[in-house]
Amino acid sequence: MVLDRVNKIAYACESPRPNRTVLEDFCKQLGYSPVLFKAVGADGTEIYHTNVMMHVGTEVAVVCLESVRDEAQRAEVKESLESTGKTIVEITFDQMNHFAGNMLELHNKDGQPCLIMSLAAYHSLTKEQVEFLESKMTLITPDLECIEQNGGGSARCMIAEIF
């Protein structure tokens, strides 16, 4: 699942891993609202990890909306993000496959926002997407090819989100 910590919303791709009952229990205990949807890759296979297709930060959400095939669910995700003031940066399946959904916003020692993404994710973005993201925060783009090719995850997967 991907958490909007500011607005206490938990976004989750419905699959065997993020079980609806467990998600609802998590949300109830921590005061979050769930947004559950089905998402698939370009080949139609289920997306198990929401952070493959979505990043939600303070002001920006990076989302592969085309992976949410059901129009009502896609509209619900989009409405939820927009209603909380997020600017949506839509990514394509190709960008998602280059880990562009696997980003994480952190803050540096001075409290300034930084967006961590792999070099592959960064290179998959358009010039306009990069310029927009850079206008909002500092981008940190390490080369994680070894991790991405051998482990299957990327930048967000490497950072423990205990904060």
Per-region residue spans from a language model:
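The feature marks the mature, well-folded catalytic cores of soluble enzymes
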Residues: M1-F163
